[in-house]
């Protein structure tokens, strides 16, 4: 296992030395044991503060995998069910024919409510009630359950409000109390970073090879309006980092990898979900053309079922999420690995993750 650590360390050192990245963290657990805990580069724009294992990174949609995991834990414990209708606990959401939308629809992005208002600002994301009221009153873009389309930001609000109404706790509170605290990672896995921990957040660097903004008025532009697109300025905004938005998260690699390892059942006797539940979570469920992004997509129950670096995935075994800033966290049931990669440069490619994933696949499966 020493060789795996050395190979990953050499790879991320090269990414920093080449200028492709400013700072990275990588954590890998295999059957519950840490086999990689590697860092490289700097955490600030002045190249002074070094990345360490406790550095927190804005991880964009990698956070969706964390939010999804909270939902599955709540289903496991009987607090939610996949076929529970959102409107049963959030009546306002049922407007405009959305009364049949279920938790399952939310998880696989078939609910039909991906849009936000055009001039939304980063500060608006912290106004939970306003955003939820807007979504509840939004006519669906398609008959719910009939098509899929990436709910880039609204995913976390719909899921979070369902959790809040059903349990009396925010999704962030459930994450902290039921998952992060028992696993000893409560300071490193966040929806809404506490003010006193903002100093530990790596500053995202220039937008590098980030993809161009969506065409004005396009479905993607309506789902991610210009004011809340994932640029470096957005990711560094204190309002964004402090906001409890379960569509995106701030975390360390070792924390989110430990969470995925716990889902696999390999951490200190802590069983977050049963083996049967785990199999359900990882099973590809919905395929089709994404109505927001416009490309073919396949989803498991809230996760991507593909390995982020192009390594061949095993359907029903691999599950996780990637972020638009090049971060990723995922697990593989068959090989028993849980992997997380955090980066602090907004980039539009997954080259670092691909290189790391290839090392992991060749060494551990």
Which residues does each predicted region cover?
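Hydrophobic core segments within long, regular secondary-structure runs in both alpha-
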Residues: 128-133, 357
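Solvent-exposed loop/turn segments at secondary-structure junctions
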Residues: 113, 156, 346-347
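Short amphipathic alpha-helical face segments that pack within enzyme cores
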Residues: 65-70, 154-162, 255-258
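Recognition helices and adjacent regulatory flanks at domain boundaries
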Residues: 120-125, 133-137, 141-143, 148-150, ...
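Amphipathic, well-packed alpha-helical segments that form the structural scaffold of globular domains
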Residues: 13, 111, 136-140, 160, ...
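Short active-site loop at a secondary-structure junction
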Residues: 13-29, 46-106, 143-153, 244-247
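Active-site helix/loop module of the DD-peptidase/beta-lactamase fold
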Residues: 53, 58-62, 74-114, 118, ...
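Catalytic loop of the DD-peptidase/beta-lactamase superfamily, centered on the K-T-G motif
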Residues: 1-42, 54-55, 147, 164-172, ...
């Amino acid at each position: 296992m020493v060789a795996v650590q050395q190979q990953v360390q050499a790879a991320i050192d090269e990414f920093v030395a080449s200028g492709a990245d400013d700072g990275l963290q990588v954590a890998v657990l295999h059957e519950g044991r840490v086999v990689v805990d590697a860092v490289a580069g700097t955490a600030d724009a002045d190249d002074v503060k070094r990345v360490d294992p406790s550095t927190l990174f804005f991880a964009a949609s990698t956070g969706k995998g964390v939010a999804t995991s909270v939902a599955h834990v709540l289903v496991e414990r009987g607090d939610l069910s996949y076929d529970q209708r959102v409107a049963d606990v959030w009546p306002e959401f049922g407007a405009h024919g959305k009364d049949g939308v279920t938790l399952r629809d939310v998880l696989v992005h078939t609910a039909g409510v991906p849009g936000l208002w055009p001039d939304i600002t980063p500060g608006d994301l912290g106004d939970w009630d306003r955003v939820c009221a807007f979504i509840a009153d939004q006519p669906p873009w398609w008959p719910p359950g009939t098509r899929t389309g990436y709910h880039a930001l609204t995913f976390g609000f719909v899921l979070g409000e369902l959790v809040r109404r059903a349990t009396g706790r925010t999704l962030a509170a459930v994450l902290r109390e039921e998952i992060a605290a028992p696993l000893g990672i409560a300071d490193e896995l966040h929806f809404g970073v506490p003010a006193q921990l903002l100093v530990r957040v790596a500053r995202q660097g220039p937008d590098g090879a980030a993809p161009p903004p969506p065409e004005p008025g396009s479905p993607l532009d309506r789902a991610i309006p210009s004011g809340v697109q994932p640029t470096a300025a957005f990711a560094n905004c204190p309002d964004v980092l402090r906001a409890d938005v379960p569509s995106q998260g701030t975390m360390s690699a070792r924390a989110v990898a430990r969470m995925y390892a716990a889902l696999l059942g390999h951490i200190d006797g802590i069983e977050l979900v049963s083996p049967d539940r785990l199999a359900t979570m990882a099973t590809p469920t919905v395929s089709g053309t994404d109505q927001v992004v416009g490309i073919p997509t396949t989803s498991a129950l809230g996760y991507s079922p593909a390995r982020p670096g192009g390594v061949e995935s095993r359907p029903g075994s691999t599950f996780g999420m990637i972020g638009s800033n090049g971060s990723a966290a995922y697990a593989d049931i068959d090989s028993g690995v849980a992997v997380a990669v955090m980066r602090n440069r907004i980039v539009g490619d997954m080259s670092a993750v691909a290189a790391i994933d290839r090392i992991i696949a060749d060494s551990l499966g």
